[in-house]
């Protein structure tokens, strides 16, 4: 691989990681200001459960790109906060399905509004066509590596 390509690759990785971190920090700050006792990591699990609850911890691992110990810890903490509950699967008692509590359902609207607000701030001066190109390129990179 030519040296200049490697440096380009470092740049892309740096920029995407830096942007992702900046968005996460801003969203966390908004959660804190709004009095939501929730980390970005916990929110990402809730986000996937809002899309489809009653999924296994393994499915949460796949959806969030986290390993089993990380998801177990996050679900443990969400359970302590009374935001999720584990229910043994009727088909396979070794599997726990994760369901939202009423308290978690109440957080959905406010937290999603804050997330949308944060993304709007992040993309405020970016033209729509550049956003589309960026999404395409990142999808290709992901597809190449999965």
Predicted regions mapped to residue ranges:
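N-terminal leader segment of winged-helix/HTH proteins
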Residues: 1-34
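C-terminal regulatory/oligomerization modules of transcriptional regulators
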Residues: 1-7, 128-146
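N-terminal positioning helix adjacent to the helix-turn-helix/winged-helix DNA-binding module
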Residues: 12, 41-42, 103, 130
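Alpha-helical linker/hinge and terminal dimerization helices associated
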Residues: 19, 23, 30, 64, ...
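A cross-family signal for key residues in well-ordered alpha-helices
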Residues: 47-48, 62, 109, 135, ...
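Charged, amphipathic alpha-helical coiled-coil/dimerization segments
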Residues: 76-136
């Amino acid at each position: 691989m030519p040296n200049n390509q490697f440096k380009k690759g470092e740049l892309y990785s740096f920029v995407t990681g830096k942007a992702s971190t900046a968005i996460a920090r801003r969203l966390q700050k908004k959660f804190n200001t709004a009095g939501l006792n929730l980390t970005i990591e916990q929110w990402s699990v809730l986000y996937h459960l809002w899309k489809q609850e009653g999924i296994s911890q393994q499915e949460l691992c796949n959806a969030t790109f986290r390993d089993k110990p990380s998801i177990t810890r996050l679900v443990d903490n969400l359970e302590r906060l009374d935001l999720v509950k584990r229910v043994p699967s009727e088909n396979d008692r070794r599997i726990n399905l994760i369901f939202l509590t009423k308290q978690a359902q109440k957080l959905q609207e406010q937290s999603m509004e804050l997330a949308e607000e944060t993304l709007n701030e992040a993309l405020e001066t970016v033209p729509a066509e550049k956003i589309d190109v960026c999404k395409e390129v990142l999808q290709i990179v992901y597809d190449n590596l999965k």
